[in-house]
């Protein structure tokens, strides 16, 4: 497995830490061969016994098949030609017994091979998922979500099937090939010229077919990713599609992606389909030649007729072994893109790694940005999202972040839990540089309510306990009460045991936001980040939540990203972002006097409120 996978990867590519694709042949081949040797041992794991037993059973099964042509020849020569019915019965019973033994060995061989390949796939899938869990937001952006899902499912299934085929056929084929060739030479060395001519012809034919088919396999994986991305995007945004009556557009987009995949698959299938008729022609020509020359030998008495029948059967074994080799290589050619894509994930070095700088028992919540600049990977042309950000936040401060759309408010708060690392500058928490914090400890002290409120399939209790698995029901209800979710939870059909559907589709947007806030509060974080997390709430509910924060969470540093001035006017300080920079910092009253941007936002919202009031009147 290591040898074949490493050899197939000679011309592949890997993604380095910075997302740069490096191409190479000799150096990369050695690097990947080393990686695959290490990974293969890791993925075999506790299934090593199946990887040992399965080939042994396959060899035993192949041995029974090698005995049958010999016994068939003996039936003809010692039974039928000698008119000895007793020999026919005796040898026939032996053939039946050996066939049944081969059947049992085949069943056990297939079973152990399946366990070996399934265990290999299981371990590979676990390793892939563990690796993805270490990815930062930037790393996830490097790979598309649909592509990662495809790699963890369909690609690993292809690799799993390849492992199964290697265990079965790559042991079976050489056994049949070598033993059959030796027997043929012992039966009649002169007739061996037939398979010496047939094998090169068969290999040349199969090589040409594989060569013209290989590019289609890589294209199939790429187009399968595109199709999965199309389906995933449509399912996630189905409400938007329905609202804007864009079903026909989405159908056409899916049809194009489906057509591209289908055309590529058909192209590969047509070329693969050439193997059978071409191989059949070579098989038949070899058999005809063998009967022609063998018939003359039988007529001259140089060869027994039973031996000729055995010779034909062994020749078929030889040619079939070559076909099996080709089937394995074809499978590996199809698996190569899948393996490449899985190795890209497994070899990817996350851009954000924990430095294991210890696990502080507590955090005060002081935050300091020193000349921080940030731009998203691949977005250098469009400029920085944040530039030269300098700000200090005291422990327990309630800080609001406002500004026009697209100025980097979400990016600003996403840097604090290290979802991304700044391109320039440094961030400190409690005087300790952010990169030196243990990543798990850092995020354990920070509660985040994202712009997109994500709930998982499961009960309300399961979702609330996401950040605090040992929390009691009393603690759950207390956090829900602080987030103004207590009342509607109690009115749900099963209360805390009410099942939340995937994505929280069976609760409203406001309920989803409140559940996410309660989930974050349950962590008892030292720093709480609310990224536009009350936008779906009415002003009364929002005010109650913030009143609770001011009264009960005075020791928690809170950063609130908001669009509504009414949401932030009671904050200790308000940061105004504009043009990727901090243009002003102050209280609500100070900014109304000194910051034109803040005043413009405030005035526009006041005018909007008055206009809405006039229309209602």
Describe these PLM feature segments.
Residues 23, 28-32, 361-617:
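ABC-type nucleotide-binding domain
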Residues 1-7, 14-68, 72, 80-94, ...:
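Membrane-integrated ABC transporters
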Residues 59-67, 100-107, 159-162, 166-178, ...:
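Hydrophobic alpha-helical transmembrane bundles that constitute the permease/transmembrane domains
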Residues 46-48, 134-138, 154-163, 167, ...:
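An intracellular "coupling" helix at the cytosolic face of ABC transporter transmembrane type-1 domains
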Residues 82, 118, 126-150, 154-156, ...:
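Short intracellular "coupling" helices and adjacent cytoplasmic loop segments at the cytosolic face
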Residues 84-90, 183-197, 267-340, 345-346:
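Helix-loop-helix
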Residues 46, 50-63, 98, 102-104, ...:
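Transmembrane helices of ABC transporter permease
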């Amino acid at each position: 497995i290591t040898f074949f996978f490493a050899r197939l990867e000679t011309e592949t590519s890997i993604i380095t830490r910075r997302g740069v694709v490096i191409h190479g042949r000799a150096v990369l081949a050695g690097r990947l061969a080393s990686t695959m040797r290490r990974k293969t041992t890791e993925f075999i794991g506790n299934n090593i016994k199946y990887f040992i037993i399965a080939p042994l059973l396959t060899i035993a099964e192949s041995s029974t098949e090698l005995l049958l042509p010999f016994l068939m020849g003996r039936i003809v020569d010692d039974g039928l030609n000698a008119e000895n019915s007793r020999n026919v019965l005796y040898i026939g019973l032996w053939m039946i017994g050996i066939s049944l033994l081969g059947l049992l060995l085949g069943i056990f061989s297939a079973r152990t091979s399946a366990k070996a390949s399934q265990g290999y796939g299981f371990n590979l899938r676990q390793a892939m998922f563990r690796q993805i869990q270490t990815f930062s937001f930037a790393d996830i952006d490097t790979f598309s979500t649909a592509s990662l899902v495809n790699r963890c499912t369909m690609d690993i299934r292809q690799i799993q099937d390849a492992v199964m085929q290697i265990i079965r056929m790559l042991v079976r084929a050489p056994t049949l090939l070598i033993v059959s060739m030796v027997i043929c030479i012992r039966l009649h060395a002169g007739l061996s010229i037939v398979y010496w001519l047939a094998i090169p012809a068969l290999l040349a034919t199969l090589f040409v077919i594989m060569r013209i088919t290989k590019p289609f396999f890589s294209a199939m994986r790429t187009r399968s990713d595109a199709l999965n991305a199309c389906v995933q995007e449509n399912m996630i945004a189905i409400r938007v599609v329905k609202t804007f009556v864009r079903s026909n557009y989405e159908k056409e987009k899916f049809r194009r992606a489906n057509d591209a995949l289908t055309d590529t698959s058909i192209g590969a299938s047509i070329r693969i389909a050439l193997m059978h008729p071409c191989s059949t022609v070579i098989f038949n020509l070899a058999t005809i030649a063998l009967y022609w020359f063998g018939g003359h030998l039988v007529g001259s008495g140089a060869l027994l007729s039973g031996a000729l029948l055995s010779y034909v059967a062994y020749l078929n074994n030889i040619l079939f072994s070559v076909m099996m080799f080709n089937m394995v290589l074809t499978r590996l050619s199809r698996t190569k893109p899948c393996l490449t894509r899985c190795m890209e994930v497994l070899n990817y070095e996350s851009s954000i790694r924990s430095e294991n700088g210890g696990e502080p028992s507590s955090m005060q919540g002081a935050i300091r940005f020193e000349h921080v600049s940030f731009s998203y990977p691949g977005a250098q042309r469009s400029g920085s999202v944040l530039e030269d950000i300098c700000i200090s936040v005291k422990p327990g401060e309630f800080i609001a972040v406002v500004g026009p759309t697209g100025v980097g408010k979400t990016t600003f708060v996403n840097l604090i839990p290290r979802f991304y690392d700044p391109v320039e500058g440094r961030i400190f928490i409690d005087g300790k540089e952010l990169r030196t914090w243990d990543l798990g400890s850092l995020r354990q002290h920070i509660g985040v309510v994202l712009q997109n409120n994500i709930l998982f399939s499961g009960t309300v209790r399961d979702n609330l306990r996401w950040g605090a698995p040992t929390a009691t029901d009393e603690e759950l209800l207390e956090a829900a009460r602080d987030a103004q979710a207590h009342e509607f939870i109690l009115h749900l059909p099963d209360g805390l045991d009410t099942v939340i559907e995937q994505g929280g589709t069976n609760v409203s947007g406001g309920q989803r936001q409140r559940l996410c806030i309660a989930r974050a509060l349950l962590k008892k974080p030292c720093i709480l980040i609310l990224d536009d997390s009350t936008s779906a709430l009415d002003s009364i509910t929002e005010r109650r939540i913030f009143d609770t924060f001011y009264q009960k969470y005075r020791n928690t540093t809170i950063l609130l990203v908001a669009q509504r001035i009414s949401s932030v006017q009671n904050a200790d300080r308000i940061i105004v972002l504009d043009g990727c920079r901090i243009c002003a910092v102050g209280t609500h009253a100070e900014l109304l006097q000194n910051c034109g941007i803040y005043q413009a936002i405030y005035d526009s919202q006041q005018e909007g409120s008055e206009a809405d009031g006039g229309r209602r009147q």
